[in-house]
Amino acid sequence: MASADIKSIGLFIDGNYFKLIDNGLKAEARRVNVKNLIAFIQQSIAEKYELDPGSCIVTESHFFRGRYKAYDAKKLNLLLEDRKFEDRLIENDVVLHYKHVYDLPDGTPHEKGIDVWFALETLELAMYRDFDFVVMITGDADYEMLARKLKSLKIPAILLSWHYDNQDPTAKALKDEISFQININSLLKADPSLINKITEAVSVLKG
């Protein structure tokens, strides 16, 4: 285990899922405040496990997503938006993991192997970094077995879910395997002011 004083948290972010959250906030002229969201995760774990809030620290954050090559992103007018999005992650010491996106013959964007990379990297780092907790921001059923494996290693697998769809897209198979869920939608219903703590207004920002 990690130090008795510090409880180490590994944070692993499904990039497509996270971008959908950010896109959903656009209608409110807001975006995720990465620093404050990380602080909220630390606070939530401390409350759930009755720990000193100052002892729960996200020691590593990793982000996984497919990305267009620079030329393709520029052609699709995505280059600046994507780089500004990445800047926010980098400013908060989030490690970026990318594979190139390719278009299928029918024009559908396709990314291969990101989910496998996410799972392998999460499991490997959970063991080698000796995390006390692993938090996943995702909703994909593909990570059901990852959550189960983490629990077999006596590492709580925590899910943060947040969606702007009419129905919760979080896979039931995944929810059945996690140790506990930080359900932002439910928390916002109970305390609407939370939105001001974990997001920020876009209009007043330069970047």
Question: Where are each of the predicted segments found?
Answer:
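Domain-level signal for Mg2+-assisted phosphodiester chemistry and nucleotide/NA-binding surfaces
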Residues: 1-110, 156, 163-165
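Nuclease catalytic cores that cleave nucleic-acid phosphodiester bonds
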Residues: 85-207
